[in-house]
């Protein structure tokens, strides 16, 4: 069965796995893991990674060239709307007018849970300034709807806390967000292993974004390959339509036409 592309804002993608660039041991490992993942969208923390701000330091764009990947600047490390807006403005300047950004405004350093009040404020400002916003948010369906109605091009509810590896803790609310949404819904944060990615896709999500699950694995390149397969398998399972759940057994062999009685 031929799948449709993933459409985010004005862009089209074949891969439904998005990856980050943090926590790798060096740029070579970063490069190899991203290649193994098959990802087309690579997210970059503007406040933490050099993409041209410092000419004396290694430039991440040497291994993720913008002509090969869609670079998705993110506002990781921002705890209020103003700093998130400033970070997006810097990203646009560094990337020659690039308007697609991942907005995340965090509530505290312990949980890195999204501050939805500041997120809404920043999203409104950035959308008014012409940005296409993919937004990290809680798994609250009402907040997700509000972010979509104001013009965000993708909703990215957390599966569980950033870097926790706890998987999809509230699949029911993720499902509600997806059912209500008219823009792509991508699970962002909390994926720990391939089965978590497959579950997110089986719920009907349009994609999964991850970083630590790959970078912190004992073999990041192999894990990146596993995540690619998991996202593809989960997507195919969703499109195929799972069998209904039943309380009692239902024999797979026919009850008539026995050879022996």
Swiss-Prot record:
InterPro entries reported for this sequence: Aldolase_TIM, Thiazole_synthase_ThiG, ThiG
Entries under Gene3D superfamilies matching the protein: Aldolase class I (3.20.20.70)
Function, as annotated: Catalyzes the rearrangement of 1-deoxy-D-xylulose 5-phosphate (DXP) to produce the thiazole phosphate moiety of thiamine. Sulfur is provided by the thiocarboxylate moiety of the carrier protein ThiS. In vitro, sulfur can be provided by H(2)S.
Keywords: Cytoplasm, Schiff base, Thiamine biosynthesis, Transferase
GO cellular component: cytoplasm
Source lineage: Bacteria, Pseudomonadati, Pseudomonadota, Gammaproteobacteria, Moraxellales
Protein name: Thiazole synthase
Subcellular location, record wording: Cytoplasm
Pathway noted in the entry: Cofactor biosynthesis; thiamine diphosphate biosynthesis
Binding site for 1-deoxy-D-xylulose 5-phosphate: 163, 189-190, 211-212
Enzyme category, top tier: transferase
EC number of the protein: 2.8.1.10
Taxonomic source organism: Acinetobacter baumannii (strain ATCC 17978 / DSM 105126 / CIP 53.77 / LMG 1025 / NCDC KC755 / 5377)
Protein's UniProt keywords contain Transferase: yes
Molecular functions (GO terms): thiazole synthase activity
Family as reported in the entry's similarity comment: Belongs to the ThiG family.
Active site annotation, chain numbering: 102
């Amino acid at each position: 069965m031929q799948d449709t592309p993933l459409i985010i804002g004005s862009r089209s993608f074949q891969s439904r796995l998005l990856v980050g660039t943090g926590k790798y041991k060096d740029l070579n490992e970063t490069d190899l893991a991203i290649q193994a993942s098959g990802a087309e969208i690579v997210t970059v923390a503007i406040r933490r990674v050099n993409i041209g701000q410092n000419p004396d330091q290694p430039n991440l764009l040497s291994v993720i060239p913008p002509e090969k990947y869609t670079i998705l600047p993110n506002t990781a490390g921002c705890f209020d709307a103003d700093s998130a807006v400033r970070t997006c403005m810097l990203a646009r300047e560094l990337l020659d007018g690039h308007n697609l950004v991942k907005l995340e405004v965090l509530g505290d350093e312990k949980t890195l849970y999204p501050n939805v009040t500041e997120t809404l404020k920043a999203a409104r400002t950035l959308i008014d300034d012409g940005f296409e916003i993919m937004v990290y948010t809680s798994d609250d369906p009402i907040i997700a709807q509000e972010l979509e109605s104001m013009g965000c091009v993708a909703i990215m509810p957390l599966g569980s806390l950033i870097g926790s590896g706890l998987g999809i803790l509230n699949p029911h609310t993720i499902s509600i967000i997806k059912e209500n949404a008219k823009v792509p819904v991508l699970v962002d944060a909390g994926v720990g292993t391939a089965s978590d990615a497959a579950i997110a896709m089986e719920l009907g999500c349009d994609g999964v974004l991850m970083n630590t699950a790959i970078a912190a694995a004992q073999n990041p390149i192999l894990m990146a390959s596993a995540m690619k397969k998991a996202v593809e398998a989960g997507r195919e399972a969703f499109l195929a339509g799972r069998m209904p759940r039943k309380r009692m057994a239902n024999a797979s062999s026919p009850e008539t036409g026995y050879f022996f009685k």
